[in-house]
């Protein structure tokens, strides 16, 4: 059903990659590949039958799309997995310092482009600017359209609350508009836009001399994340009794 990370890169300092594979009964599978320069080092089988950790070494691999062959009994499944070339431009980037003036904002509450007010394929949600705890419809394009505003204020860095997918249904007049209930760590919430929209926003911000801080939450996730619905291991969460 899914492999995380969704792709990886050749040329990294650490050539080992850990893939978390999620799918029905995938724990029982053996995994192989004939992609040049890639070696499967080990498989780790977790408590849940629906997870498998695959450790690969890609030290001698070149960019391209590889086939991962999963075998379980008589069943065989080929899955494509992309190895991209490492973009070295980030080596020159500098993080924020005490010389920066940071402007923190919630993308849902800052500005709306009007493009992403109703997105299909998500759990039920409502956009209603009269309700303080429901979504108000702000998005990444709305922020991008107002980058000059930040220059006029004199700020030098933007800090958004998390923009990754929060696919939890509304509960009455309460929602996860704030972004702190991640359900996919590799996908921008489509109500804010796409991964490419985020890249474009960051690129345009840099052109205007603005740094961008990406807020990511790793010590908890949303109740709709697969890790909650089907825990990889019995001790995956420190306080599972809360679930």
Model regions: which residues?
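Short, solvent-exposed loop/linker segments at beta-strand-coil boundaries, enriched for Pro/Gly
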Residues: 34-42
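Low-complexity, Pro/Ser/Thr- and charge-rich linker/hinge segments at domain boundaries
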Residues: 2, 83-104, 109
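Non-cytosolic beta-sheet module surface loops
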Residues: 22-25, 58-60, 72, 162
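Substrate-binding/active-site clefts of carbohydrate-active enzymes
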Residues: 111-243
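Short beta-strand/loop motifs in extracellular/secreted proteins, especially
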Residues: 27-31, 66
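Beta-strand/beta-sandwich contexts
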Residues: 1-27, 85-86
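Extended acidic/polar, glycine-enriched regions
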Residues: 45-95
